Amino acid sequence: MTAVQTSGAPGSSSSIRVRGQATINANAEPLYVIDGVIVQGNGASGSSFGLGDALGNGSVSTISPLSTINPADIVSMEILKDASATAIYGAQGANGVILITTKRGKAGEAKFTYDGMFAVSQQNRRVDMMNLREYAEFYNELVSVGEIYDANAYYADPSILGVGTNWQDAIFQTALQHQHQISASGGTDKVQYYVSGSYMDQEGTIIGSNFERFSVRTNLDAQLKKWLKLGVNATYSNTVDDLKLADGEAGIVFSSLNSIPDIPIYDVDGNFTSETREGLGSRVNPIAMAMLDDIILKRQKLTGNIFADVTPIKNLTWHTELGFDVSHSKSETYEPMVDLGNWQRGNNETRWQNNTNTFWQLKNYLTYANQWGKHNVTAMVGQEMWESRWEYQSIYNTKLPSDEVHNPSLGAGTPTIGSGFGSSAMASLFTRETYNYDDRYYLTYTYRYDGSSNFGPENRWAGFHSVAGSWRFTQEKWMENLEWWSNGKLRLGWGQTCNSNIGGYAWGSSISPMDSALGAGYRPANIANTAVQWESQTQWNFGLDLGFFQDRLNLTVDLYKKVSEDMLMSMQLPSYMGTQGNGSSALAAPKGNFGSIENKGLEITLDAHPFVGDFQWDSNFQISFNRNTLVALSGTTAASIVGYGQWSDVVCVSEIGKPLYNFYGYVVEGVYESLEDIENSPKTAKHPTNGVYNRANTVWVGDLKYKDINEDGVINEQDRTDIGSPLPKFTFGWNNTFRYKNFDLNIFLNGSYGNKVLNYSLMNGPSGGLASMRSAWVNQNNDAIKDRAQLTPIDPYKVYEDGSMWYNDITNVKVANSGTKTPRPTLNDPNDNDRLSTRYIEDGSYLRIKNLTLGYTFPKKWMQKAHFDNIRVYCNIQNLYTFTKYSGYDPEVGASTQDSSGYAYGVDNGRYPSPTTYSFGVSLTF
């Protein structure tokens, strides 16, 4: 399993993949089940709450439904990976299942617990950008080589300048967090209870961002009769997110990096400032954007279930359960008028959106369990049905009377009102049988028959099987004398699951409004495809469990192969079908089943307990290898699926026979170091046909030299190729816990190896990327500046009678720092040096000290005098340090939502970086 934190914003989610990427376009996140109830909306994007524009198209942040849950209520998490385990969840378990169990009461006197925590978070890493002195030197060089004609008198002597404005330091803050929980548990032999209430307030490390949560939980179990048990699980949460446009080329992070250091944050009166300067364009003050623009998301969520266990006769139990998940959210955005130099916003604007989601789930199943001698048998048969409904209403308006008024109904502009609704439903029958002989031989069979409203009437139902067997060979007589070998088990499993995560009514054609010269009208929003059907998944799993020395040393090995067929995705159609255009005219392509994906891998877990007694050491090491391959694409003539960036840049492709999401671009071989080098190399698009070179309009010395992949002597789009995979070769985690008497120390390391990251911020932006060096008014990464191709005259004494300069004479220009792979600075960039290439692909491998916790539990004799059952204090550091070669903030980059296709992975477009958090906590039980 790989878990990638998509954003460092408080309340954000992780992108989790269980045994690889099993689908290309349908939801690839695992199923979360809390106390038997399915969690709705795993990692929803901001657009789901009406925040798509406010959070930007380049956003990789997602709003986590798990952020509404108090982690202190959780007692265990179990990950179901192989098909024999997930098959009972049918269509919902194709991407794996994460089972979360919360705390329950136990018989005995009431116990009260207080858990408190205070934390401080910081961004300890900085991207190496130019300070004012370095920027002045760079500006002067552009003047010296003719890229800029007007020198700036303020930069005449860079040595007397200071460092200027450090915009990174300005947007980051030391963020405070505190969390408090009070819980009570206890009960009698008949009734047990657990109740809790918690509050958390967490500042983000980007100024203005914040997350606040209040939650309560009640878990109740009552044995009313010998044959009847009732239970209730319920939790309510209320959260408020103060979000910021952090990600993407228009986000605060990128704006802070590309803002030049000679602009102050505030003027002499303490007001936000910007700059009025030719060439700067609509330059945003990132501090003003963070503090002036409001993006608020308020959520309320009620989740739980009511269940009963009835035992009418011996060995037979009937379980019935009604689950529910009801949520309401309100998003509010407000952008005030702005008059800050080149940054102008003529009108204020606001948008409100209300979302309501209602989910109910009904389960009934009978379980029969019996034992005859050494034979143990269980048989279960049941049904499940659920329905999920959603609706929203939104209103947008401009020209509000003042910045204190955010109600869109009071705006003087023309209001825009939107609404929508939809639903999905599923009905299922399932059965599972298990057989165990003498704790040696095990067999399990599972079958599930699902019907989903996400498909048309002809393809609504599908059935899926799984079977698994295991042999505990250490129970055999011939193993009795090997006392040091405590456990040995072979496992083999095969199973089918399915995927229906394409949304309700995706098989039909929806209606969308559109404006025309004749007034309002309606059009089809998408092309229908009633033939779309289930995406199926078949998985083999072979496992080996070994235990030695009374299980003080345990080894678990799993080999698996998982094949997904009939992939759910949008059909690739030519533009003449009407599938391209703006939002008011584009006709969405139909959903269909196209192709297959294969994941195969190896998982190894080593669990050891080397020391026991006063000093104890528990160690757990896990490593996972996964190979992902796009096996086939059917129903389309396309050989690959292309993911697009913010400006329709091709960033990645998924080609048959290769892993998904490979980056797609040019291979940089170096730079042209002389005219002779240009003439002896394949011709570029800007190679002069008449032989006359021009520094501003044709290829030039110092421009990038790209590899001629197809060897046709020309550099063009046919020379783009696979330039790296964002998927790791392996991931790993190592957890160590040391205990000495009352002290405990936990150290958790994790990492990833072999994955590449596209540092998109270096390549592209409104006025150029952070390493493109094609603008004098965009700050640049120091690594690029230091390694740039430095042009120098071959003959510095050559005289030009027409008054020309050496840098305009290609016969007299060479690169001084031979061997560099970074181009010359050029404002026109005729060679397109900032096109996607290996120059922007970096090694994303890392080793991270993820968690370090030191705790102390007070001795029992001390606690008894204070009338406490338990007192524990601890300090913790999260994300202490990351060992990596990646030049950005954080190499942990997952799926990107910068395009609705969802085909991009490992693209760092200025994401909200993950902070280092220092915390101190106390737990009291009495």
Report each predicted region and the residues it spans.
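Transmembrane beta-strand segments that form the barrel wall of outer-membrane beta-barrel proteins
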Residues: 116, 197-203, 443-452
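Residues on the lipid-exposed face of transmembrane beta-strands in outer-membrane beta-barrel proteins
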Residues: 102, 114, 182-186, 216-222, ...
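A beta-strand signature from Gram-negative outer-membrane beta-barrel systems
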Residues: 1, 71-113, 177-179, 192, ...
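Conserved C-terminal beta-signal and adjacent last beta-strands/turns
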Residues: 618, 725-753, 836-883, 911-926
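Short, glycine-/polar-rich solvent-exposed loops and beta-turns at beta-strand/coil boundaries
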Residues: 4-12, 89-94, 209-212, 246-248, ...
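Surface-exposed loop/interface segments of Gram-negative outer-membrane beta-barrel transport/assembly proteins
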Residues: 28-29, 34, 45-46, 107-164, ...
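Short acidic/polar hinge/loop motifs at secondary-structure boundaries
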Residues: 37-81
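Extracytoplasmic beta-strand/coil segments of soluble accessory domains associated
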Residues: 1-46, 76, 86-103
